[in-house]
Amino acid sequence: MKRPLAYITAAWCGDPDTDMELAARYCRMAYEAGFSPICPILYLPLFINDAIPEEHKNGIDMRRDMLRRSHVLVVCGDEVDEDVKNDIAVAKRLNITATTLDLSLIHI
């Protein structure tokens, strides 16, 4: 069975350990729901240095490209920041379905 791609977004807190743990849990939930999750925060920081302006821009471009290839945008968490708003706007413009996760299912 081919799983549709689900782009995972959230207003990440900025603490790498916390963000990675939450992202992995969100991805697991999307996987269990039948999707192939795509979550750039899980791997882009491994090779993109956001302190370098060109790399920061390239990271944004890569995230947008991944979102464009996705079938659904999954918005996670209770907060919405500018990155999440931008993801929602891109998804809307491209007619990509957007949904949220039931956060009561996440156990921290």
Predicted region positions:
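Extreme N-terminal starter segment of soluble prokaryotic enzymes
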Residues: K2-A6
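Acidic/glycine-enriched connector segments
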Residues: T18-I96
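Short, highly charged low-complexity linear segments
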Residues: M66, L103-S104
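Short acidic-hydrophobic, aromatic-tinged amphipathic segments that line or gate anion-handling sites
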Residues: T99-L101
